[in-house]
């Protein structure tokens, strides 16, 4: 994104936004208390989302909500009222359609007497930008907070044959694996078809696979998925094309 000319100013608090003839002036203060103004053409404000539970009259029937107006549920997605279940954006967790879909399946299985569950560690997140961004599992920051020792495998699309063939080589695949067991703990991708490639790593994590398991799986050539294999090889410094 920086290569595309986008500048990032982290930890800046917006104090005011004023319209002017050519656009807007944004007045900010950073964490050191220094003030800085930015002149811009357009202002896009992204403040997140909240559960759309207003108007459902949940309080009237006694459904319990948390401090953010999300419906409280147990591990089976059951509310405090036995025959009422809740899933998706109105409960705790990422507001993603595929997360809600898996929860819906789990609820149906539980109602049918089966043992439905959702593994939240393997729910991928995708940002549909150019280049595409995808992630799953833990980040390095989270692993450090958990005092989990880990290994990193990283491979650039610059060395991927398919990416070079279509002249789309921006980005990389990064895999995080447990330092002792080699179990895949997370992955982060930036580049072509990242949202598609993340599924392979999700399957690996769902079945407790190691980076070695991915590395020993034959990937067709030339494909973008070879970058995943190479990143897995790179965990033990065995990448072939980097």
Residue ranges and their predicted role:
Residues 20-21, 67, 179-181:
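Short acidic-glycine loop/turn motifs at beta-strand connectors
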Residues 16, 62, 76, 174-176:
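Short, surface-exposed charged micro-motifs
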Residues 129-139, 144-242:
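Flexible, glycine-rich terminal cap/loop adjacent to redox cofactors
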């Amino acid at each position: 994104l920086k290569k595309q000319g986008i500048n990032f100013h982290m930890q800046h608090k917006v104090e005011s936004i004023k319209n002017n003839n050519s656009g807007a002036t944004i007045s900010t203060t950073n964490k050191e208390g220094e003030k800085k103004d930015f002149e811009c053409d357009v202002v896009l404000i992204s403040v997140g989302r909240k559960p759309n539970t207003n108007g459902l009259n949940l309080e009237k029937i006694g459904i319990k909500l948390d401090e953010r107006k999300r419906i409280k549920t147990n591990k089976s997605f059951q509310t405090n009222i036995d025959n009422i279940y809740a899933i998706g954006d109105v409960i705790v967790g990422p507001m993603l359609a595929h997360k809600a879909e898996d929860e819906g399946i789990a609820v149906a299985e539980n109602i049918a007497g089966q043992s439905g569950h959702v593994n939240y560690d393997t729910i991928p997140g995708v940002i549909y930008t150019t280049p595409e961004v995808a992630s799953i599992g833990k980040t390095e920051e989270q692993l450090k907070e958990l005092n989990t020792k880990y290994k990193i495998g990283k491979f650039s699309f610059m060395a991927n044959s398919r990416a070079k063939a279509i002249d789309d080589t921006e980005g990389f695949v990064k895999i995080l694996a447990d330092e002792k067991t080699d179990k895949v703990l997370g992955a982060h991708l930036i580049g072509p078809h990242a949202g598609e490639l993340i599924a392979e790593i999700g399957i690996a994590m769902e079945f407790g696979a190691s980076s070695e398991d991915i590395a020993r799986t034959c990937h067709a050539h030339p494909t973008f998925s070879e970058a995943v294999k190479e990143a897995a090889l790179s965990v033990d410094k065995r990448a072939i094309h980097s």
